[in-house]
């Protein structure tokens, strides 16, 4: 299996975390999105959307979109609950991550770290919705160790990378103790150093 990804991307980190935790062998192929490497003809042949992460399996099939890859790799493992309703709850968090968390928390980080904008340059809506997403996550974690069930799951993996890096987007986790404790639990459970 080959993982095409950018180490700086939280979406790519999800796939790496999952493969590492499940001890799935892979070759990492670095694609620097800031240098346009996901827009080359060679890469676009593999993924016409021009996005990472992308996994190419040994049989030549390719799969894009971080949460689809994570969920596929996790099938039959402890990362994906057996109970159909619990599986649906993991999907709920994973969809929420892509529509209500990542577009704000990750984009603020991207603009500050990679586009070298200042906090004052960020759109107020971006900051407000990112903070709201982190508040929603805090509420979802209050009184529980993980997002779904009593062990780490694909839902946690979907939300972990960009939440761990939220400070790079100007978001403060100091007032979100459940989230900070959850990050530490996930790092231990997933053997992230």
Name these PLM-found stretches:
Residues 1-8, 13-124, 128, 138:
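GST-like domain detector, emphasizing the conserved glutathione-binding G-site
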């Amino acid at each position: 299996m080959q993982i095409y990804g950018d180490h700086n991307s939280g979406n790519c980190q999800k796939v790496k975390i999952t493969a590492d935790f499940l001890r799935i062998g892979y070759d990492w192929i670095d694609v620097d999105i800031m240098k346009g490497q996901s827009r080359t003809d060679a890469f676009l042949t593999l993924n016409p959307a021009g996005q990472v992460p992308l996994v190419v399996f040994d049989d030549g099939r390719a799969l894009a979109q971080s949460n689809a890859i994570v969920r596929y790799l996790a099938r039959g493992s402890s990362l994906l609950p057996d109970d159909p309703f619990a599986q649906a709850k993991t999907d709920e968090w994973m969809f929420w991550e892509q529509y209500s968390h990542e577009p704000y928390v990750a984009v603020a980080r991207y603009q500050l770290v990679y586009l070298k904008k200042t906090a004052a340059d960020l759109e107020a809506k971006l900051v407000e919705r990112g903070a709201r997403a982190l508040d929603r996550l805090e509420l979802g974690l209050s009184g529980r160790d993980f997002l779904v069930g009593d062990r780490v799951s694909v839902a946690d993996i979907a939300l972990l990378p960009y939440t761990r890096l939220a400070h790079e987007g100007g978001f403060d986790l100091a007032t979100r103790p459940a989230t900070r404790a959850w990050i530490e639990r996930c790092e231990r459970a997933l053997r992230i150093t």
